């Protein structure tokens, strides 16, 4: 039996405050372009089965309760109490919360209160630029205000996050090298001239400027890869070597082995277990084992990737803990590892690596 400390969930979002019907709840279970096909349900997925396995006991039901029974119990308890029970039952001691997604979601303080945990903010660079653009009348004011906003955010947040630079097929490739002042001014002028209020930043020059502004801050930079091949990051990874800023690659499944290879090849790169474990459910141990084939154990960080449904935070944590126990416990049981080493590595991946990388403990020194 592998004992792990309380987890640090190094990437997640807030949860919805409202009651959810069957259709709304089901829509949050999967990343999908639309509702389930006629005659099917998103509950018949690895994520759906994982929710039914792990969440009902936290709400006082038997494992594998039917969706109807589970949602009825959810309504009996109410959204706030459901979130409280699920978050507190997940064994998470600290959350790093990306506050840059739309919707009526709880912020870090509310998530901390509901989960009886610490919570820290990860600032999304795109949202920061969009907020500054909404209040800046000229290109010069925008760039000056953006620099000040990044500096101010770095004093309170534990990390920056970029969600679009390396993930979107409709976004041109971002040059890995920092853009010059003239290129940045030109890109800012074009963007400000044509964007509506609240318009998203997609310009590759501005995205590169945001990335390099974050690198200069010294805060860890979380980079989404989603389902894209992390190989697209290689140029930026090479260019940022030696700056002292840690890059944490989020997502990557089904290319998680490539993420692990980048973490092994570059001292400043770290690999995230991510929402893939919750999405793969009963196969999570196999996915985690593949990540641990190549990545140095001090470079792997747990996250749930939970968003909107507290069930996804809970499932991410509980599936991870079980998968970690199965993988490391299996290697120890067969004699490949000692039990002491297995528990030491479990503690690193579960919490220790994140606490070191993000300097969550005041006495931590930079990695």
Where do the language-model regions lie?
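Alpha-helical scaffold segments that flank or form the walls of functional sites
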Residues: 24-115, 121, 143-155
């Amino acid at each position: 039996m592998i004992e792990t400390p309380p987890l640090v969930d190094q990437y997640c979002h807030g949860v919805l405050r409202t009651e959810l019907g069957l259709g709304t709840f089901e829509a949050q279970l999967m990343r999908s372009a639309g509702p389930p096909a006629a005659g099917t349900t998103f509950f018949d997925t690895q994520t759906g089965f994982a929710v039914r396995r792990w969440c009902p006991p936290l709400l006082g039901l038997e494992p594998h309760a039917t969706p109807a029974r589970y949602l009825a119990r959810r309504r009996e308890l109410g959204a706030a109490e459901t979130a409280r029970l699920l978050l507190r039952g997940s064994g998470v001691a600290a959350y790093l919360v990306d506050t840059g997604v739309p919707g009526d979601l709880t912020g870090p303080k509310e998530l901390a209160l509901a989960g009886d945990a610490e919570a820290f903010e990860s600032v999304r660079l795109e949202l920061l630029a969009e907020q500054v653009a909404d209040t800046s009348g000229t290109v010069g004011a925008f760039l000056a205000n953006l620099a000040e906003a990044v500096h101010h955010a770095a004093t309170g947040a534990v990390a920056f996050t970029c969600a679009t630079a390396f993930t979107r097929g409709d976004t041109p490739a971002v040059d890995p090298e920092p853009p010059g002042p003239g290129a940045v001014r030109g890109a800012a002028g074009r963007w400000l001239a044509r964007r509506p209020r609240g318009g998203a930043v997609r310009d590759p020059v501005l995205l590169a400027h945001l990335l390099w502004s974050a690198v200069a801050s010294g805060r860890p930079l979380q980079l989404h890869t989603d389902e894209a091949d992390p190989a697209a990051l290689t140029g930026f990874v090479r260019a940022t070597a030696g700056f002292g800023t840690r890059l944490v690659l989020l997502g990557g499944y089904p290319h998680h082995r490539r993420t692990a290879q980048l973490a092994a090849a570059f001292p400043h790169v770290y690999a995230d277990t991510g929402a893939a474990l919750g999405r793969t459910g009963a196969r999570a141990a196999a996915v985690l084992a593949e990540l641990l084939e190549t990545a140095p154990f001090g470079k792997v960080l747990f996250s749930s990737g939970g968003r909107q449904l507290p069930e996804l935070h809970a499932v991410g944590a509980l599936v991870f803990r079980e998968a970690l126990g199965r993988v490391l416990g299996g290697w120890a049981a067969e004699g490949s590892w000692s039990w002491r080493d297995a528990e030491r590595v479990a503690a690193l991946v579960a919490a220790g690596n994140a606490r070191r990388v993000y300097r969550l403990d005041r006495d931590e020194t930079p990695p």
